[in-house]
Structures are given as structure tokens and as C-alpha cells.
Amino acid sequence: IMEKIKGYTSYIYLHVKGEPLIHPELDKILKIANSYNLNVNITTNARILKDKLDIIINNKIRQLNISLHSFDSLDEIEEILYVIDKISDSYISLRLWNNKDNSDILKLLERHYNKNITNDKRFTLGDNVFLDRDVLFSWPDINIDEISKYGTCKGGKNQLAILVDGTLVPCCLDNDGYNKLGNIFESDLESVLKSNNYRKIVNGFNNNILVSELCKRCGYIKRFKGGI
């Protein structure tokens, strides 16, 4: 896979859906990515981050995105903050993507980092450590009612996702492979980027039209200007 994507991107994100830190060959994957000089980004619930700390520190990780809303208690979050303090060579994005009252979590962050947190969507907590806030969104589901026919997205334009079986899809929210563009094990990226299916989806986004039935049922579309 690394051989096929080189020349097309300098960044890889080790997630579509699921927890990347539990992969049994995480260390091997990171070393392969590092050998291709790729910037690795990981999104994690961080529940086993302490156990995987040596792997994280001993490999080049550009950014760790940590979902703070996945924890059950403030004590768990506080423990993770001390683990994060040991990671000095990576950007850390602490995410609060929910519609709840996060005042207790914010107070904990203020104490730990000795900061008065503002209402900015992105707030700098420390060296390379950021708090990122946004509202909860609904994942795409082909079985729900249509949300909108109009909107745009970065899927396909700025990113492609590769599923475990090699299926290529426009974005990381399509974990079931509904918008299948091809397979990385069976074809090269150039042919995928020239395919009619890919061009239809991207041209639709460029014209504020949602071509895919799955995209019409995706709540994330509301985050982009033009989405309804």
C-alpha cells in the first residue's frame, strides 16, 4: 500500500473506524510508514495509550487526535493528560466533539495546563497541545432518511480512505465501502482518480451537489459551507 500511495500524499491517517492502538502490528506499520517518510496521524480514544506509549515515542507520529468525550470519568482523563506530557515530538489534539456540558473537563484542563480556556474552537493548551471543540455530528447511514441533496465535502478531493480489504472510498466515514472506487490491491491510484465514479462524486462536491446516496445521509456535510 505504501508503495502505491507514495507520490500522491505525504500524510496518512491510521483510522477509518475502530481503534488503531489495538492493532497487533502497530509498531511494524509505523516503522514502514516512517521508512517512506510519511507523516502519520492517529485518532484514538486513548484508553490503552499508556500501554502503547513506547511504540508512540519510538516512532515518528505527526499528530495524535484524542477523543476526550470517550472517557467515563475525570480521573481517567487526568491520567491520560500525564501520559500525554511524556509525548514531546507529536502534535496533540484533545477533542471535545459533543453537545454536552463540558465544564468539568475544561476546569481539569485549565488546572493541568495552567490556562484560562476561551471559547475558541481551537485553543492552545501547551507546546504542541491543543483543545479542539465542535458539535456532535451524525454518521452517514444509508438506511436513514435523506438529509440533503446539496452540499460539499473534502472527501475524494483532499482524502481517500482504504478499508481493511483494500477497498478505496472517498472518505473515512464510509466504513462499509458504499462508495467503492476500486481496490488498492487490484489497481493503481491513477486509474481510480480517472474513473467515472470518482469524477462524478468530486464534480458534484465542486458544484454543491451530493451525488452519492450515502453522502445525502451524512450529518458531517453540515460542517461545510453550502451543506444543509
Feature names for model-found ranges:
Residues 26, 171-172:
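Active-site-flanking alpha-helical
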Residues 162-163:
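Short, acidic, Ser/Thr-enriched surface-loop or helix-capping motifs
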Residues 173-228:
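Flexible mid-to-C-terminal extensions adjoining Fe-S/redox cofactors in radical SAM and related proteins
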Residues 128-148, 196-197:
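Short, positively charged
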Residues 159:
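Short hydrophobic/aromatic beta-strand element in the GNAT-like acyltransferase core
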Residues 153-156:
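Short, small/polar residue-rich loop motifs at catalytic or cofactor-binding pockets
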Residues 1-125:
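Conserved glycine-rich "GG(E/T)P / GGGxP" loop and the immediately following alpha-helix
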